[in-house]
Structure formats: C-alpha cells, structure tokens
Amino acid sequence: MKIVYSGRFTELLEETPLSVQKAFYKQLRFLAGDIRYPSLHAKKYDESGNLWQARVTKDWRFYFTVEGDEYRLHDIKRHPK
C-alpha cells in the first residue's frame, strides 16, 4: 500500500512533539506492512466516511482513509480520554 499525506497532516505532524513524530513513523512502517499489526489497534472510526483510526502512542492517534491501494493520512491528534 502507498502512503499519501494531506498538506494538513504534514503541518499537524510537524507541530507534534519529537517523541510523537518518532513513534508515528514507527507505526507508519507497520501500517504499510499490515493494517492489522497489533500495536496499531487500527479500527474504523467513521463508517460513513470510511475513516480509520490507529494508535501512535497511548495518548496520540492518527486518522486515515483507505482509497484503492493508498492510505491517505488526514489528521493526528491527542486521544480524548
């Protein structure tokens, strides 16, 4: 699968702490290999928009859609508790 970053996602990622960025890139490698990789905890977030959520860390999540052979990254933010 190919990874596509939205412009907004790139900006949001740059604003996250460096430790979160490092964890994100590690998780992204897992996503590229297998969406069911255990540490991702990937799940459908919104059925109507085909939006998925995956774990970066305990406190951070990223959001993406699956379009053909692409994962399109849309958002990264703190996980609400």
Spans of model-derived segments:
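Enriched for short, Lys/Arg-rich terminal
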Residues: 2-7, 11, 19-22, 55-81
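N-terminal first-folded block
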Residues: 6-38
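A short, surface-exposed loop/turn module that caps and links secondary-structure elements
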Residues: 29-54
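A periodicity- and composition-biased signal for non-globular, repetitive helical segments
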Residues: 8, 27, 33, 49-50, ...
